[in-house]
Amino acid sequence: MNTVRVTFLLVFVLAVSLGQADKDENRMEMQGKTEQGKSYLDFAENLLLQKLEELEAKLLEEDSEESRNSRQKRCIGEGVPCDENDPRCCSGLVCLKPTLHGIWYKSYYCYKK
């Protein structure tokens, strides 16, 4: 019976000591994996940031092209309706109420002086 107790005690001590070693190895392995995972996350984050910056640059470029092409005229030509409070008629033109043939429009138009 003493032999069984000694054997059991020996197996128990070996299991505990090897279990501790495995626990330490597992802890170190997990730390290595988390550090490796952080480096992968940093890499993925940098890659995503680069893609977003490229996309933003393209969008800003399109906006600048769009604003260049869709620029409003700075003055209104002859015979075009205008606002009496904010006349934008070109030089040599005046924003006046139409006479005779344009009375029914009830609007102001750019006419030559």
Curated annotation (Swiss-Prot):
Propeptide feature: residues: 22-74
Domain of life: Eukaryota
Signal peptide: 1-21
GO molecular function: sodium channel inhibitor activity; toxin activity
Tissue distribution of the protein: Expressed by the venom gland.
Keywords: Disulfide bond, Ion channel impairing toxin, Knottin, Secreted, Signal, Toxin
Family: Belongs to the neurotoxin 14 (magi-1) family. 01 (HNTX-16) subfamily.
Reported function: Probable ion channel inhibitor.
Swiss-Prot/TrEMBL domain comment: The presence of a 'disulfide through disulfide knot' structurally defines this protein as a knottin.
UniProt name for this protein: U11-theraphotoxin-Hhn1a
Organism: Cyriopagopus hainanus (Chinese bird spider)
